[in-house]
Every structure is written in structure tokens, then in C-alpha cells.
Amino acid sequence: MSFGVLCFLGLALLSAPSAAEKNGAYYQSLQKRLIADGFDAAAIRELYARPEVKFETKGISVYFVHRESKVHYERYTDQLHIEKARVYLQQHRAAFADAENVYGVDPEVITAIILVETQLGTMLGSRSVLNTLSTMASLSDPKVRNLLWRKIKNTPDLTRAVFDKKATQKSKWAYRELMAFLRHARSQGFDPAEIKGSFAGAMGIAQFMPSNIDTLGKDGNKDGKINLFDDADAIASIAFYLKEHGWQPGIERNKAAKVIYHYNHSNEYVDAILSVTERLKG
């Protein structure tokens, strides 16, 4: 068990008091909610007292101005990306074959998703999932919202009305995701403060949100754990996700588009996935 995990389970760090004081104004009410919802009080206090657990002002401001239309998905259909995707297909052919046999999902569409989500597992995100979800979840507290607004109010294209609406909506969602993340960390035995992910808290090669892992994550390499940073687990998990949302062998393109839309609610994203899939099959 790593030193970080031991800290999460309750060992105090020498730097904890200063970190706790720094995060106190932001995470005090959040910690109370987590404890009230059944998390161990000592473990939660120790976790949020660690110096690497911070309120992510910069990261959260990116979230508030993100627009899908600004993501250039078309680049993934160029020859360089397609060739890399074909290499990935070959490298993990056994895992793809297993996923296709069990779930009936084409290896090419799984590869397309991994290509677009994480560039075939090479870009997994650099933001702390714990910090991201904790920051968003804490925005249910009006005092915390005001503190954050004062720091990011000069962000381009962001008004107070838009900020308040989005903060209120997403704080509830983020709290559910945070609880799922902490439970997953506990069940799988990893340190929640060490996991990196996207600006919204998605994690692993498959870029699953934490709430999807326990219900849709699969142990592709049969090692007894669900680790979405492992290629075989990610491949099996994506296959199961698509199957659960309606994917079938030989599915028509319009129906495939509806299934993929569940993975990311963006028409541009869906078009890119289908285009890459078709090129890989061609």
C-alpha cells in the first residue's frame, strides 16, 4: 500500500494544518456533506488537509467557458491518426477480439473512441480528478460560489448569470460524481489524490466519469480489478458501455450515431467517431 493511500486512510501529514487552513473556506461545507453521507470523518478530514488537495480556480474557469464547437475533431481523420489507430488495433488485437466476442462491438469503433478521447491512451488529462470534482461540488455553497466568482469574473464570455446557472446545475452532478470517485478509490485501493483526468473529471483511457465505472466498467485483463488506465479494461468497458446503450453487430449508421451520442453529447464528436470507424474498416 502506497504512502498516499495510508494518508487517505488516516495518517496525518506534517503539512496538513497549513493545507487545511488554505482549503477551509472552500471545502468546509463539502466535508460536512461527505461525512453526513457516510464517509469516514477522519479519512475525509485528512484527505482534504493534504497539500496537493486544492481548490482548482484555474481548472474550473476552463470548465465554465468550454464549448464543444471549439474542439477540432476533424483532425482525427487524417492519415497520421488513422495509421496510429491501426497500430493500436494490432497491438491490442487479443483484447479487441475478446470484447467483440463477449459484447458484439466492432473493434474499430472502440479504437475510434480511444483515439478521440485520449489519443490512444497517450493523453489522459493532467488535472486532479479529486480537486476538479471537489471544486465543482463545493459550488452548492453560495459563499464558495461568491469566492470563486470574484476570482474568475473577468474570464472572457462568462457572465454572472451564466456562471450562477451552470454552477447550480453542475454542483449537484459533481457531488454525485465525487462520491462515486471516493467509493471507487476505496474499493480498488488507490489514492484518490493521485488520479489525473480531464477538466470535467473524466478518467482513464476510456475517459469514464466515476459514476459509470462501477456499473459499466469491466475487468478486461481478468486481474480482479477495474482499472481504466489499463488498455484491456478500457477496451472491455467501452464495449460494454456501447452494448448497454444499444450497439448491435451490423448496426446501421444512424442507429450507431445515437448510441455514440450517449458517450459524448456532441454531434461533431459523433461524426468524428463514425468517420474514423469507417476509415479503419476501409
Question: Language model features by range: what are they?
Answer:
Residues 1-4, 8-201, 205-207, 211-282:
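Cell-wall glycan-active module
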